[in-house]
């Protein structure tokens, strides 16, 4: 990273330390590749399947969500991810739970950057914030309607429960 910064590759270092990239060696340096590009074949196959499912979907909100999610997989655009998530959030009465999400977990590599005080100070001076890499998670399930209804009842009572807690006045 220091070698790349010395060579004036600030933008590439910023991309390498972002959540959305795969990192590969490129000669003496490293190269960041957005995961929509790196996994373009796999994402394209998934997007095609989602678009096919949208064609047969009878629920308009679900159909819209599938279309937006397919586009999010094909584009190097975080806003598309957010738009797909917004369409999913609008669907409250669906019998299916279908989620494609980016999850960010602490990895073992990113914290090592903070152990090198010279490097982290240099990154801070350049306004580069290291971020752990994202993972994609896909989940499909059938909604437990009774369990969901019970959780919604608890949700409605959360303020009341909070007032019953010790030190609720803080």
What name fits each language-model region?
Residues 11-170:
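Fold-level signature of zinc-dependent metallopeptidase catalytic domains
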């Amino acid at each position: 990273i220091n070698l790349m910064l010395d060579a004036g590759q600030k933008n590439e270092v910023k991309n390498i330390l972002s959540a959305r990239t795969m990192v590969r060696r490129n000669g003496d340096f490293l190269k960041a590749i957005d995961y929509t590009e790196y996994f373009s074949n796999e994402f394209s196959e998934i997007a095609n399947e989602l678009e096919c499912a949208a064609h047969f979907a009878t629920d308009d909100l679900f159909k819209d969500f599938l279309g937006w999610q397919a586009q999010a997989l094909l584009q190097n655009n975080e806003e598309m991810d957010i738009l797909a998530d917004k369409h999913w959030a609008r669907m409250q009465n669906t019998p299916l739970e279908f989620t494609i999400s980016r999850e960010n977990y602490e990895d073992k590599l990113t914290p090592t950057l903070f152990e090198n005080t010279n490097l982290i100070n240099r990154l801070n001076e350049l306004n580069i914030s290291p971020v752990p890499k994202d993972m994609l998670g896909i989940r499909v399930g059938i909604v437990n309607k009774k369990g969901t209804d019970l959780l919604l009842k608890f949700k409605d009572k959360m303020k009341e429960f909070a007032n019953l807690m010790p030190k609720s006045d803080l």
